[in-house]
A protein has these predicted regions:
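Reverse-transcriptase-like RNA-dependent polymerase core
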Residues: 25, 57-80, 93, 100, ...
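Active-site-proximal segment of RNA-dependent polymerases
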Residues: 16, 103-160
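Conserved pre-motif C helix in the palm subdomain of viral-like polymerases
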Residues: 81-111, 198-208
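Conserved polymerase palm-domain catalytic core
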Residues: 53, 60-61, 133, 137-208
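Non-catalytic, polymerase-adjacent accessory regions of viral genome-replication enzymes
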Residues: 1-55
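Conserved, non-catalytic sequence blocks in retroelement Pol enzymes and Pol-derived host proteins
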Residues: 46, 118-119, 204-208
């Protein structure tokens, strides 16, 4: 789904691991990551010893001994109940570093109306395009139109990690970078009371 010119550019870039995990790149990623977050307690705590933390992360990454720390889980109600898994600042910095490398590789494959975490997109453009589509479909409010609000239940909990890794690794030439991504994907594990397990139990209970 990527044009040949872009594939050639991507292969030339090569996702060189040493450049990705370099000190300079990590500090650059930190400046991007901390935007609009500088007053958060966990960000300020990490920044108190910023150089030590970044150098330690770099050393772990370059030696391939990086291990993802446990996620902090908390509950929100907006209005439905959801359990949120939040990584540490150190790990979120590593996530941001990886995001920067993968963004251009996959952005061109997304449909136009995918708005989250994309340059030049976002919720404001999404709302504006919905309003434009409603005006067009309703002939400038001359007729009634309907919109279906829907969501994929437990989407992230149900993602097949093996298939996700296969999709990503097809676009990456550096094996060390691929191993790092696989390690981070594998860091998220569902609890015993996960969606798939509960669905199997429900189907079993409903079976005659």
């Amino acid at each position: 789904f990527l044009n040949n010119r872009y594939i050639a550019r991507m292969d030339h870039r090569g996702h060189k691991y040493e450049e990705i995990v370099s000190i300079s790149n990590l500090f650059s990623c930190w400046q991007e990551f901390r935007k609009n977050k500088a007053v958060r307690e966990d960000i300020m705590e990490f920044e108190r010893n910023l150089e030590d933390n970044v150098f330690r992360l770099h050393e772990d990454l370059i030696a391939e001994r990086y291990e993802h720390e446990p996620y902090y889980k908390f509950h929100i109600y907006d209005p439905k109940h959801r359990i949120i898994s939040k990584a540490t600042v150190r790990d979120r910095l590593a996530h941001h570093m990886i995001f920067n490398e993968l963004y251009e590789v996959f952005d061109q494959s997304f449909i136009y109306h995918s708005y989250a975490s994309r340059l030049g997109k976002g919720s404001h453009l999404g709302v504006a395009n919905v309003a434009r589509a409603l005006r067009k479909s309703s002939l400038n409010n001359a007729r009634t139109v309907y919109a279906l609000k829907c969501d994929i239940r437990k989407f992230f909990d149900s993602v097949d990690h093996r298939k996700l890794e296969q999709i990503i690794q097809k676009k990456i030439s550096d094996h060390r970078f691929a191993r790092l991504i696989s390690k981070i994907i594998g860091s998220f594990s569902k609890t015993v009371d996960n969606f798939a397990q509960r669905e199997r139990e429900r189907e079993s209970w409903l079976s005659p």
